[in-house]
Amino acid sequence: MRGLLIWFLIWVCGPAWSAHAYAQFGDIRYPAGFAHFDYVNPAAPKGGEISLVPPTRLSNFDKYNPFTLKGSAPPGLTGLVFETLLTGTFDEPTTAYGLLAEDVTVAPDRLSAVFRLNPSARFTNGDPVLAADVKHSFDRLTSKEAAPQYRTIFGEVQGVAVLGERSVRFDFKRVNAELPLIAGSLPVFSRKWGLVNGPAGQILKPLDQIVTDTPIGSGPYRIGKVNFGRDISYERDPGYWAKDLNVRRGLFNFDRITYKIYKDNTAQLEAFKAGEFDYIQAFIAREWARAYTGKPFDNGQLIKKELKHGNAGDFQGFQFNLRREKFKDARVREAIGLAMDFEWLNRQLFYNAYTRVRGYFVASDFEARGKPGADELALLEPLRGQLPPEVFTADVPLPPVTSLDPASGITLRDNLRRARGLLAEAGWTYRDGALRNAKGEPFTIEFLDNSGSMGRVVTPFAKNLEKLGIAVNTKVIDFAILQKRMDVFDFEVISSRTVGSEAPGTELLERFGSRAADTEGSSNLMGIRNPAVDALLDKVISAQTRPELVARVRALDRVLRFGHYVVPHWYGGVHRVAWRAGRFEQPAVTPRYYQPESWITSVWWATQANRDGLRRNAGDSSVGAK
């Protein structure tokens, strides 16, 4: 779910909670009064700096407000400047601990949760964080002034009531074990953010008109030096209210965190080798094998490592826009998928570094397998009239495999033959030099890309599609333009990646729900409008135990895979990262569930040489204060 780093699970059934934390399923790992998380160094020195590039490349940013649809906010802003009522950990996926809220109480009927705010909590302007700020944040984020995904995320919250100066109650529309976590993930900002002088006194701007107003959050960092479109620095707040709190002890150790923006992957890597920044994550196997080489790596100036993790695999694939008529037929989508030769790509381009994505819940317990068992059938049977018969009788679809053995029956030629048959069934036949429908219209596909790196994959894919008579056009556009087109669903086929989750829940409404298909800025890029999917989503978010959640998500995965909404890509089992030697240290314990960027910026710390260098550069400034 969004807004919380909620990772590992203790395997028992049913919701549990206590004053200092809430667990959706199972036990709470850290008891009341715990000293610090196991994976941090509580004595880590403060100081020094780290500079990096965002894992999702931005070509520009033009605002300081991450909560609205229009424009692009800088990387790092949400997690460094704003805070939530509860905070997750890197070693539990469905448990969160008090941050802005010092305790949480869930009602016996589980239809509400009361959060009592920490009296020490302060915004960066010195004001206390009060219940009125929490309600204000909720009301603004669920209004039409905010990006529409927040209305989906908090859609099961009936409302927020102020009970006292530092006490606030979230009322829920129904029993849902995840809802206290969702309420706890609310980003809280000051009621004074966006306050300006007007003719008759101070007025508050609508949230979508707060653009470059300095954020008033409660997080450990403030915005420092900014070059719009190039880089942004965050400076550690020496007076940060939670620096001695157990959920923050040993965290956020750098005095300065700088994100740099480059036009493409090549420019990023060359700048890294030249010493312009400290840390980078690689997502392209070919670049990792061939470009992360040379003198700086050979002489130890730069370190490259493949870091193990226990995360669920990320979902990635070419997503069809079902809002376009030509992609509405599942047989057409399946036929296009048959033209992608993953085995060739893995041999020739990926150095055999990847495994094929099979479903939407990659390398996890939630991935459907084989034929449905009794638990899934109990969920699917009431939907029989809305589902293809093979959902009940056939193995769940797997991506096509391409063999080099002519006798295998699954060579590329065989797969393309099957594709032609599916296209013909759907009314598309080859004539006059192209694949055409009954009206004589040719079948064309436009792939959008923002970096050009996907071109090496699309090119052989396009050659295979051309054998079917499909004309392919690949268009490389700026990230900001791509983001705008994605927000309004102005594309045909696009490559998209979603970070895997150890506890899928309400965020799936954003990815697959019918309502989100018509909501600009939603994650339902495919435009899925399927009543059976909606019914299963409803079951998923109402799961009360871990076994219930597993069965319900598997049933959802099965139905989605029979829809052939994507051409699945691939995933790797490690994080590929590189950094400058001699600048950083890290704890001996590595958490099992983490994303490298957030782990490194929050848990690592600077070496003495790094800290001394920043102090020399800062002179007598407050940067580096303890």
Predicted stretch roles:
Residues G98-T105, T124, V129, I153, ...:
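Aromatic-rich, solvent-exposed beta-strand/loop patch
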Residues V40-P45, T68-G76, D103-A147, L163, ...:
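Aromatic- and charge-enriched surface segment that lines or borders ligand/interaction sites
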Residues V160-V162, G224-E235, K260-R324, R331-A335, ...:
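Extracellular/periplasmic solute-recognition and catalytic clefts
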Residues R116, R151-A200, P220-N227, P372-Q386, ...:
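Surface-exposed binding/hinge segments that line
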Residues A19-P108, D139, I216:
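N-terminal lobe/hinge region of extracytoplasmic solute-binding protein
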Residues G71, L77-E92, S185-L251, D255-R256, ...:
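Gly/Pro-rich hinge or "lid" segments in bacterial periplasmic/extracellular proteins
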Residues P54-T56, N227-I232, R236, L338-T402, ...:
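Detector for C-terminal structural segments
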